[in-house]
Amino acid sequence: NNLVSLILNFYEENLLKSIIKSNYFYFSESEQDIVLDKCLTYLKDTSSVEYQVRIEHIYIAALKYITNNKAMILSGFIHFRLSNYMKILDYVVDTFVNELVVDREYKEFINLLKSYVNSKPSNINSVHFIYKNTSSILLDSKHKKIPFTDDLANLNYISDVSFSENDIVLNTLLTLLPQKIIIHLEKEPDEFIKTLICIFENRIELISGS
């Protein structure tokens, strides 16, 4: 148990750093730090699967080694006897690298749409977007229903980052480019509404409890 604690408390962070620098050397220093912080936080979470599994791998390997050897060079033991433990660290690093890449692509997507919105004239003064779990409705300033684009093949602005059924809403808003989008919500803004806020910024007005 003391050996397990020693490895986790004094070696694990450096092992993670080494994996990140070796496999993702093309990431900026700040991006590498983000991945490292997420890995450390996750591995300290006692509810995570990897928390207990990696402890068991170290304990079993250490017990087997000590049974057959009188002395141990710790650095050699870690690098040559803890292959399963190292695979776990590799997996955790890859998981949060993928998360970072998706987040970066999402931000690039948002920035592209923001640039588009800011570069084009508005085609309508204002719209009301009634956003509900069961259905969403788009109304003009006279409260007449605006039809959504229903042909997915003709959606012009869909990216790899998508919002399933909300793609049609996004495409319609990007086609209309209203000066003001009044969003009527039943509950707190979800990820899609937050995305609309990021894209349309001060054009958005939120009304809760509608």
Question: Which stretches of residues belong to each language-model region?
Answer:
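Conserved mixed alpha/beta catalytic, RNA-binding, or beta-rich assembly cores of soluble enzyme
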Residues: 1-167
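C-terminal structured domains
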Residues: 142-210
